[in-house]
């Protein structure tokens, strides 16, 4: 008997595998899968409902309809299993074989597989080197194709029309073969000699210099080589046998009323079979050619529709006018097999309900309605009931549960204890969207949720619903408890800050408690302990806000974790003393002795977590919440209309603004300003007025005046309810209060442009009809935007997850010394993000050295925690090199040292952590908070562009970096480089501010000079661009022809005259060739060279340049030879928000990108063409690099100027590809991180840099081969970095030449599609193309990523699954076989075993 059970079990076991391979199926392969040929289009007999023989549901081919029963009913029961009935031919077995047995159709004429024909680039066309159009003409019987030209002048693969073919047949008779249809193409493919083609293509590639030809040949070569490597034959792309899907995968279901619901595939198969049978008949009848041809074409079309309906021509529709769902549609798209059934499955043991607040819960608990719990834990209850002997059978137990007997509730309590459940709120944007809690049984039907986890779930209680899931197995419960419990997810994985921050009511309550009020009851009292103060408060002897002195016991945790205890008297308030009562030991009193705003509370919890650990901080957070709720209730903070105090000065501010606007209108009317300028100025004036009103209003709201006994008034912080809500961070913001009590301000039109008439009213005064109408614009756009934003943000997250899903921490340390240089982020002189924040939780790549003494502060390889970061700050270190994922040398995955701290846990990252997915979630989750609009630079932005000096904000020493200067005749420094920067260093050697220095700026300080705050250190003219002489000599003006190339103009104000270069377009025929230039010569008239170069000092002058010197003037170093007026740079719309982030991650090329210098060297200009200028850079070795720049582009460099590789030479937006090519990976990383962070920072979202770096690593995982060496790669081919490095290692071991390469940047979509895993790529996008390509290449998926493993139904190789996979591999290596494999036993043996078992 045991034998039999094992035998039955073994059939269900699947063997373990390590990889999946996909390739083309040969006709013989298809026949070997098949259990018989489907010859008839019939499905089932409509009288008997039995499948027709040889039809699409035939039981003989596909297996019995019901278990162990043949169709005619002669054999029934298990004992006949394996018998084939001689009457109906059906094998007696399980009916589920109808899900796996395939059939086939022998096609009367070959048919091309549409995927290999139409999926671009067409594989068939590529192999045959013909055009897709030509091949289609052959396939659909429009022309003949020559297969074997014989001795005729024709060529193989040539197309012939009908008439042409007839003529040639008359002329040459049967010396040549030409055919039409799929047979012809199949013949061409079959007779190809792939090896010979490869040899010929390689020769042609080596023999040509044309880039396009090389590209074309390489494409073909790749295709043919992949065919050879995968043992696929080209002719298999043409089908001669068509496989038929098992019938239970295309079911036919009887509905009531005698009708049937059927899968579309059955219709499509029926069509194919009908046409195929008709074609067979016609061929037997020797029908006329034209009829046969038409039938063949129809067969081809019907097979096309079956494989991919609508790919060619019109889609075949069913009776309901809808296109039929073909095999391709089954697997692609959101509703396809991959995304609907393999990546997302429905699960059992789950329920969902509305959530309500559970203010009395502890952080690790949730309230679960009894009804739900009873249903969810049913199996556990049944087994317990049986175990206790309260029910004898499962059926009896079921009855008891349905009756809801009292014993059932007791057992439910027992089952639920210590059994966590998981709560999930859709949309699950990051891993904190699913957390585990211990259920507490409650009455009612709503789930109770702990208020502190609302932030993580992004939940509120206005009708949100949540789902409950029960982890069944012991392992699942263990994981839920140790990894997913709410108490283990205190920190946000995106930025490492606490995410269980109190919000709203709790903040309000704590803030209200901690405020001080002057002259409150009991002010100045002194208490011996906090308890005494509490007693006094409860008895009404002292007010909550009274300033009092309390004696407190404070325990502080020191550097090494040692605790120091002290007792001191502190000046505080009663409320703060009450808060101190619940604060755990180890937190200093001054953290509590402040107004408890949301930020202060967050700092408190963060500090508790870092110093006291998880347990203490969780208990503390809960206590804070209870306290906050109770005091918010007692405070009774609420507001009425009177609380929105409108500032007195509002009217005068508005009138002043209106006067200014009128003034501008007048200027415009008299033609002094353009309409654009007028509009910008008006918008500017109003936004300024708005800010003023807001400021005045907040000053009014935020201050109360208290009258002292002697009649004086003292100001104190206001207790206005609205102000308190905003100030505490509980609800609302200054901007919202401004609309309530200030003025609503400027509104935007739906296209994003600003309406220049603002809404001067506020909501308290009420809006006029016109103002209300204007404001509807903005409101409606806001709603439409939100809908779009959600979809776009979700799509961005999906792409990010897909590109990063296979990145896992795989080892502890890769041992690299490489890393990224980190410095504080400084913008416009202000520190945006200090170094401490940027490097926290990273590992040092080099020693951190004290800039003053040169001592090593921290060793390389040490983790920078909060203490280490403080140390760096104290010693004024402003530049450290830290390890980064981008520079990590681990082949597959990343090492823990390059990643650093796991932000969600606060310690070094564990091996097996899926950092890719976490990074994608961290970047994608705040996506919905980003804006969608593009910003129009108006008013303020365009004005601020005209800065003309640098005024330092702090005192210190000057440091110049990267700056090339010359000394002019006034003994001042003049900058002659563009990438120079000036920074101010304080006495500790810390960098305080940093500014860019433009070309031609005059510096009034030197390196190391001391400056005072407010001193102006650099000046320049923002409106013109100077040309500065770097040598001394006499000026010689060449090609200066008055009235032709230059014209004299005098300044009305000063009366000085100067010459202006005329635009070549406006010159006569004679002047077109002339090019005005200034040349410097010595006294003898010889050329002078620019120092340390071979280039003569001559400066070509562009159109519009103003020349202030005359021929023969003496020119000193640093003199200005000419000025080029800068039209203020054209205001481009800057893309902001979500679209900007998407553009950066997709690495899109911008429309008019900046042009960067290709090499380091000296600039000169060559011969101009009609619309472009030729810019030449001569490097140190004398090699010339040419760039053609359109004339309208603003070129920022001059003749003779020295540029560094990667420096901007024509303005525009930088393209990441250029940065990578010319400045390297580190620069690219810092550019992308900065740009992406700018967008998020604007919305106040904090994301750690390392998440962005993770995605960038994935964008950089491909390299382009520049020189294949002895490898099998081709020049220009893109391959995975890890594959290339492995290949190079192999070549080096064999002593051959390794391949040379350079990194390429791919956008996230492209990177996802070009991963090594075809399963992952196919489930992402463009399923057809990915699968087609993979099949031809015979790709093998090694199942390394997470997605592939989910799809094949295994544990993911990350987290706890990593151990499982490692163990499995070890087992396989040791050669342990889990089950002894025995061959399938034949039927006689089975019968014997059965007889023995049942002793028949």
Swiss-Prot record:
Which SUPFAM superfamilies does this entry report, sorted A to Z?
Answer: beta and beta-prime subunits of DNA dependent RNA-polymerase
Source organism, top-level taxon: Bacteria
Does the entry feature the keyword Nucleotidyltransferase, yes or no? yes
Q: Which is one Gene Ontology cellular component term of this protein?
A: DNA-directed RNA polymerase complex
Binding site residues for Zn(2+) 2: 814, 888, 895, 898
Cofactor binding note from Swiss-Prot or TrEMBL: Binds 1 Mg(2+) ion per subunit. Binds 2 Zn(2+) ions per subunit.
Look up the record and give one Gene Ontology term from the biological process aspect. DNA-templated transcription
Q: What reaction does this enzyme carry out catalytically?
A: RNA(n) + a ribonucleoside 5'-triphosphate = RNA(n+1) + diphosphate
Example of a GO MF term: DNA-directed RNA polymerase activity
- Stated EC number for the protein is 2.7.7.6
Annotated positions binding Zn(2+) 1? 70, 72, 85, 88
InterPro entries named in the record: DNA-dir_RpoC_beta_prime, DNA-dir_RpoC_beta_prime_bact, RNA_pol_asu, RNA_pol_N, RNA_pol_Rpb1_1, RNA_pol_Rpb1_3, RNA_pol_Rpb1_3_sf, RNA_pol_Rpb1_4
Q: Which residues form a coiled coil?
A: none
Is Zinc found in the keyword set? yes
Q: What class of enzyme is it?
A: transferase
What are the names of the required cofactors? Answer: Mg(2+); Zn(2+)
Q: What are the binding positions for Mg(2+) in this chain?
A: 460, 462, 464
**Keyword terms:** DNA-directed RNA polymerase, Magnesium, Metal-binding, Nucleotidyltransferase, Transcription, Transferase, Zinc
This protein's assembly is summarised as: The RNAP catalytic core consists of 2 alpha, 1 beta, 1 beta' and 1 omega subunit. When a sigma factor is associated with the core the holoenzyme is formed, which can initiate transcription.
Q: What does this protein do?
A: DNA-dependent RNA polymerase catalyzes the transcription of DNA into RNA using the four ribonucleoside triphosphates as substrates.
**NCBIfam families given in the database record:** rpoC_TIGR
Q: What family does the database annotate? A: Belongs to the RNA polymerase beta' chain family.
According to UniProt, the name of this protein is DNA-directed RNA polymerase subunit beta'
Where does this protein come from, organism-wise?
Methylococcus capsulatus (strain ATCC 33009 / NCIMB 11132 / Bath)
């Amino acid at each position: 008997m045991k034998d039999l059970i094992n035998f039955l079990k073994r059939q269900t076991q699947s063997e373990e595998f390590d990889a999946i391979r996909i390739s083309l199926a040969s006709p013989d392969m298809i026949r070997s899968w098949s259990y018989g040929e489907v010859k008839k289009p019939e499905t089932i007999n409509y009288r008997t409902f039995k499948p027709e023989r040889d039809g699409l549901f035939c039981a003989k081919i596909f297996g019995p309809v019901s278990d162990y029963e043949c169709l005619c009913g002669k054999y029934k029961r298990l004992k006949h299993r394996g018998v084939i009935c001689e009457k109906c031919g059906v094998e007696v077995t399980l009916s589920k074989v109808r899900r796996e047995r395939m059939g086939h159709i022998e096609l009367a004429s070959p048919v091309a597989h549409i995927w290999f024909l139409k999926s671009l680039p067409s594989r068939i066309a590529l192999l045959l080197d013909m055009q897709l159009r030509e091949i289609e003409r052959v396939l659909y019987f429009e022309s003949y194709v020559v297969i074997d030209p014989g001795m005729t002048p024709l060529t193989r693969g040539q197309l012939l029309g009908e008439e042409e073919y007839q003529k040639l047949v008359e002329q040459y008779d049967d010396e040549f073969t030409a055919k039409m249809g799929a047979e012809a193409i199949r013949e061409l493919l079959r007779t190809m000699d792939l090896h010979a083609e490869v040899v010929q293509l390689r020769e042609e590639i080596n023999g040509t210099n044309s880039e396009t030809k090389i590209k074309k040949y390489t494409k073909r070569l790749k295709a043919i080589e992949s065919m050879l490597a995968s043992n696929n034959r080209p002719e298999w792309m043409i089908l001669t046998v068509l496989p038929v899907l098992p019938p239970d995968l295309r079911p036919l279901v009887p509905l009531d009323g005698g009708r049937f619901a059927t899968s579309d595939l059955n219709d499509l198969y029926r069509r194919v079979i009908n046409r195929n049978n008709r074609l067979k008949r016609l061929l037997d009848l020797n029908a006329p050619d034209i009829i046969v041809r038409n039938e063949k074409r129809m067969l081809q079309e019907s097979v096309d529709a079956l494989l991919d309906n609508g790919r060619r021509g019109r889609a075949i529709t069913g009776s309901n006018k809808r296109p039929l769902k073909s095999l391709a549609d089954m697997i692609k798209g959101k509703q396809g097999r991959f995304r609907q059934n393999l990546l997302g499955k429905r699960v059992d043991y789950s329920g969902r309900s509305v959530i309500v607040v559970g203010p009395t819960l502890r952080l690790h608990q949730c309230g679960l309605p009894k009804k739900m719990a009873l249903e969810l834990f049913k199996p556990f209850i049944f087994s317990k009931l049986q175990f206790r002997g309260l029910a004898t059978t499962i059926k009896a137990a079921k009855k008891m549960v349905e009756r809801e007997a009292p014993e059932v509730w007791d057992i439910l309590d027992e089952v639920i204890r210590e059994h966590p459940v998981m709560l999930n709120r859709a949309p699950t944007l990051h891993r904190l969207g699913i957390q585990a809690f211990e259920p507490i049984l409650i009455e009612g039907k709503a789930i109770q949720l702990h208020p502190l986890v609302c932030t993580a779930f992004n939940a509120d209680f206005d009708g949100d619903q949540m789902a409950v899931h029960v982890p069944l197995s012991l392992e699942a419960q263990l994981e839920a408890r140790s990894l997913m419990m709410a108490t283990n997810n205190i920190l946000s994985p995106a930025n490492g800050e606490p995410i269980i921050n109190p919000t709203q009511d709790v903040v309000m309550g704590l803030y209200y408690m901690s405020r001080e009020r002057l002259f409150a009851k009991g002010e100045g009292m002194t208490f011996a302990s906090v308890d005494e103060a509490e007693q006094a408060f409860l008895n009404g002897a002292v007010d909550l806000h009274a300033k009092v002195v309390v004696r407190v016991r404070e325990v502080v945790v020191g550097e090494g974790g040692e605790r120091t205890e002290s007792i001191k008297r502190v000046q505080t308030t009663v409320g703060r003393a009450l808060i101190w009562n619940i604060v755990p030991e180890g937190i200093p009193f001054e953290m509590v002795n402040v107004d408890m705003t949301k930020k202060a509370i967050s700092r408190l919890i963060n500090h508790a977590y870092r110093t006291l650990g998880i347990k203490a901080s969780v208990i503390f957070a809960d206590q804070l919440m209870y306290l906050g709720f109770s005091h918010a209730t007692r405070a009774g903070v609420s507001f009425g209309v009177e609380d929105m105090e409108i500032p007195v000065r509002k009217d005068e501010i508005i009138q002043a603004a209106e006067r200014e606007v009128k003034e501008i209108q007048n200027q415009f009317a008299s033609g002094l300003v353009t309409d654009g300028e007028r509009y910008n100025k008006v918008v500017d004036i109003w936004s300024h007025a708005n800010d003023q009103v807001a400021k005045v209003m907040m000053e009014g709201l935020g201050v109360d005046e208290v009258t002292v006994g002697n009649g004086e008034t003292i100001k104190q912080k206001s207790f206005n309810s609205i102000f308190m809500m905003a100030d505490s961070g509980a609800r609302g913001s200054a901007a919202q209060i401004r609309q309530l009590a200030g003025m609503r301000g400027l509104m935007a039109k739906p296209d994003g442009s600003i309406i220049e008439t603002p809404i001067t009213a506020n909501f308290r005064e009420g809006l006029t009809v016109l103002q209300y109408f204007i404001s509807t614009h903005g409101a409606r756009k806001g709603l439409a935007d939100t809908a779009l934003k959600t979809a776009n943000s979700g799509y961005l997250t999906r792409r990010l997850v897909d590109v990063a899903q296979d990145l896992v921490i795989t080892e502890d340390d890769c041992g690299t010394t490489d890393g990224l240089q980190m410095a504080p982020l400084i913008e416009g002189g202000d520190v945006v993000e200090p170094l401490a924040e940027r490097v926290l939780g990273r590992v040092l790549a080099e020693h951190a050295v004290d800039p003053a003494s040169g001592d090593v502060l921290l060793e390389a390889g040490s983790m920078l925690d909060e203490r280490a970061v403080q140390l760096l700050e104290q010693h004024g270190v402003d530049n450290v090199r830290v390890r980064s994922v981008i520079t990590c040398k681990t082949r597959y995955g990343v090492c823990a040292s390059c990643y650093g701290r796991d932000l969600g846990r606060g310690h070094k990252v564990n091996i097996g952590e899926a950092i890719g997915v976490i990074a994608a979630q961290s970047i994608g989750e705040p996506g919905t908070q980003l804006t969608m609009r593009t910003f129009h630079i108006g008013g303020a932005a365009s004005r601020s562009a005209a800065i003309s000096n640098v005024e330092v904000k702090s005192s210190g020493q000057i440091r110049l970096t990267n700056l090339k200067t010359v000394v002019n005749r006034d003994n001042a420094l003049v900058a002659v480089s563009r990438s120079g920067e000036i920074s101010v260093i304080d006495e500790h050697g810390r960098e305080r501010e940093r500014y860019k220095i433009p070309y031609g700026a005059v510096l009034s300080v030197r390196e190391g000079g001391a400056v005072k705050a407010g001193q102006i250190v650099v000046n320049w003219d923002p409106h013109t661009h100077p040309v500065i002489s770097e040598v001394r000599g006499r000026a010689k003006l060449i090609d200066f022809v008055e009235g032709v190339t230059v014209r004299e103009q005098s300044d009305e104000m000063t009366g000085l005259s100067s010459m202006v270069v005329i635009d070549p377009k406006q010159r006569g025929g004679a002047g077109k060739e002339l090019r005005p230039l200034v040349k410097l010569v010595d006294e003898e008239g010889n050329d002078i060279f620019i120092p340390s170069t071979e280039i003569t000092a001559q400066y070509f002058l562009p159109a519009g340049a103003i020349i202030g010197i005359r021929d023969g003037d003496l020119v000193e170093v640093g003199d200005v030879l000419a000025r080029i007026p800068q039209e203020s740079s054209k205001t481009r719309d800057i893309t902001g928000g979500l679209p900007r982030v998407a553009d950066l991650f997709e690495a899109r090329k911008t429309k008019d990108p900046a042009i960067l210098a290709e090499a380091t060297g000296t600039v000169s200009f060559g011969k101009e063409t009609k619309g472009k200028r030729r810019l030449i850079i001569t490097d140190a070795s004398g090699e010339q690099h040419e760039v053609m720049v359109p004339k309208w582009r603003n070129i920022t460099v001059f003749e003779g100027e020295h540029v560094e590789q990667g420096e901007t030479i024509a303005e525009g937006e930088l393209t990441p590809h250029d940065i990578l090519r010319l400045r390297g990976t580190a620069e690219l990383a810092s550019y992308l991180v900065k740009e992406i962070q700018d967008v998020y920072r604007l919305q106040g979202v904090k994301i750690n840099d390392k998440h962005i770096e993770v995605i960038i690593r994935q964008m950089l995982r491909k390299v382009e081969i520049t020189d294949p060496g002895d490898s099998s790669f081709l020049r220009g081919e893109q391959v995975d970095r890890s594959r290339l490095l492995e290949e190079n290692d192999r070549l080096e071991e064999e002593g051959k030449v390794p391949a040379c390469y350079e990194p390429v940047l791919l956008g996230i979509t492209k990177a996802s599609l070009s991963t090594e895993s075809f399963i992952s790529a196919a489930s992402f996008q463009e399923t057809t193309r990915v699968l087609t390509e993979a099949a031809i290449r015979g790709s093998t998926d090694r199942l390394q990523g997470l997605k592939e493993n989910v799809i094949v139904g295994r544990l993911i190789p990350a987290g706890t699954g990593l151990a499982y996979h490692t163990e499995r591999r070890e087992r396989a290596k040791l050669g342990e076989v889990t089950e002894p494999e025995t061959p399938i036993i034949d039927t006689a043996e089975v019968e014997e075993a059965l007889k023995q078992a049942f002793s028949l």
